[in-house]
């Protein structure tokens, strides 16, 4: 009997390190706006890691600030920009389990003491730290990754502080790198302009604790737990109240396109968008392809359902509350009928749809973890 010649695996796999430099340069120019593809390329072989720089948009950009007036003057102060992403774990189309796993959180380089550089293709991995469980090493190639914007956190020395922070770049088109930073320090606001590089104390416009700080169309927005909402001009620092005054509300910026107000008693919701010219809220019955994520330690975010495939459990024109005492919930949809009599059944609002059950694994820092069952 003739013996079959054993074929070496190395003879089958191409040696990507031998690719011409000219071709690598052409590839790199097409990856400038596709940062996760650049990460994938870096994981092909060791020589490619020096050819393809790590995407700057995935790095936690930081701004050095003057010594923080409420802390020791010997400690340095930095404001860190944390990119946020929604990870959807890919499952085979014929999988018996029809559920979809999601992780929502910030992304940064692994600087832990036990960090080791992994061989290709595991170099293209994310370590997921869910409280109460062992860290999970998740290959990016097995995930769909959707950017959700970013948040800012204040670092005093090497430790993150629990101060809400908002950052507003000025004159981005003209360059110069000027900015204004606004911090919530419990009893007062602190403001810093890059042109002066000193902290200015700003009296809070509300007696309640601040709920969230964010920016929209070149201005700061501050919401408070008593329902107050103020718009703060970055030049004059004048705070203008934004009506209506409602205890249970969520403000959700959709990039710089729309600002949504979600009013809820958690049984039903009404949604309005801000008409800046008329200075009023206009009620809407359609969110388009948007999925709104409300509450939780990461704040309020949205993603476009156009980027999500059919059958993944999340669809456009829906609201998902990531805050609450129960670990099970359902996406809210507009026009859902209840079991009440027709005369009492007001369908002109968002209600729990009971379509796809959402099971939360973790709601707390640093990552939101949940499963959508279909």
From Swiss-Prot:
Against Pfam families, the record matches this protein to: Beta-prop_KIB1-4 (PF03478), F-box (PF00646)
The F-box domain is annotated at: 14-63
Matching entries from SUPFAM superfamilies are given as: F-box domain
| Repeat is among the record's keywords | yes
Name the residues that span the membrane: none
User: Which keywords describe this protein according to UniProt?
Assistant: Kelch repeat, Repeat
Which InterPro entries does this one have?
Answer: F-box-like_dom_sf, F-box_dom, KIB1-4_b-propeller, SCF_F-box_domain
Kelch repeat positions = 100-150, 249-301
This chain belongs to the protein called F-box/kelch-repeat protein At2g24250
Organism per entry: Arabidopsis thaliana
